[in-house]
Amino acid sequence: MEIWRATNRLLKCGSKQLLDHQSNRHFLTSSGCLASGFMYGFPKPLGSLIPHIVNYQKYLHTYCRSPYYLGATSCSVQSRCFSSEPTAIRRNPKFSTINSDDISHFKKILGERGVVEDKETLKTANMDWMQKYKGASKLMLKPGSTEEVSQILKHCNSRCLAVVPQGGNTGLVGGSVPVFDEVIINLGSMNKIISFDKVSGILVCEAGCILENLNSFLDIQGFVMPLDLGAKGSCQIGGNVSTNAGGLRLLRYGSLHGNVLGVEAILPNGTVLDMLGTLRKDNTGYDLKHLFIGSEGSLGIITKVSILTPPKLSSVNLCFLACNDYASCQKLLWNAKKKLGEILSAFEYLDSTAMDLVLKHLNGVRNPLPSSTYNFYVLIETTGSNEIHDKERLETFLLDSMESGLIPDGVVAQDINQASSCWHIREGIPEALKNAGAVYKYDLSLPIEKMNDLVEEMRTCLDARAKVVGYGHLGDGNLHLNISAPQYDDNLLSQIEPFVYEWTSKHRGSISAEHGLGLMKANKIHYSKSSETVQLMASVKRLLDPNGILNPYKILPSSFSIQQ
């Protein structure tokens, strides 16, 4: 009976510090869509919510991971140029350098506004969000149409000018910034929604559309995007597709390989590949769009996307739960799959080190479970169409989990502000790490039972020299392993690498779950792919990009870039 009363508190009252906004004004308040992109519609006993946003651009709360948004940080962040990487990379001597004739030619294509030579603008475009990778490009082009991208690439290919496609520049592996002086092709001006079918839910848009803007458009139509990222306020759909971004909804809706129906891509020689199909079924030969999904702009530049979007469901619930150990987190996941079934839409976890960093380095955040300290925290979201049905299933799940001793404490968000606060803890971890100083980031896929083993072994290895943080998408086996230190140190890096890659390979994991390879992991691809597979990938690269001008030095080992 005591357990039932505890569960009832968790469902009806929650943690007083979290739910009593009069007594706790430190929690962030926002209106509009949550991090997951859904409008939270709670049953009446749990509170009401405005069901519709008339002007989404005016009222939408944005969580942005852009350098502009995060420019003012509490701690200085070390900048690290490519030349200071452990493995030196040589510029491919066959690539030409920009001259005045090239610039004049680009101005004829784009006009004055589409050719950017301003040093301050280029300074931002040359550096990644983490301020870890820095290139030296002297030119950024901003095409506004497919034809303009085609003409740009045709000229660059004829002159052997290397280029790097860039969207929101929110990547974490150095994939969207130049290594040397590559021409930056920024697709942000190509941001039109071309069509949307309200019956099928199929959206066709240009590559420069910001993910959150697409979510806002779809929200009015009664749909949502099938992916959600912490960087949604800055990242662009073309970059999402080219990196096969995963995010918070993969557990429910799967990867972009399953949701993207078609793409338009421009080959290095300027050829426009129109694969912008809107059919769920098309079994006519090779499905070439999959070559470009996850290719990180190395085979062609994606300019348009056709994507299947699911309906926005009205009943959404969010739990923030505590666990004493990682074994309980695993059992809780199994219990959630069994008890919640198809309404389970997110299952995220973070360890106590991650929580401590967020509380210390992210402004406006407080612990929703302040009464005790726990080793792990789990964020669970359910999404369905029947509030009563979903609430009953959630109650059953929570009661069973508490009776089993899996969750000693937890809260259920009672309104959108509380849910936003919980999501902000999880999504704010990258910003908190950035504010804390230097950070070494590893995005790994592992068997779920092995994820915390790597975190613990890394802590043993590094001891007190750095803080080892473990968090991620537990529901799909994606660990975000982060090592936080006061500054970048090659001696520390030598203790992390290649250990983390060898450990991952030994346990049949992947060294990149969703961030891609970029520059950071190009020379590490052999930890996840056989030599035969890498050779075949190189053959595809040679076929589509014989001059190697598209995003060089990325994905494939640097030796290949020089030899090509």
What is each stretch, according to the model?
Residues E2-Q564:
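Noncatalytic alpha-helical scaffold of FAD-dependent oxidoreductases
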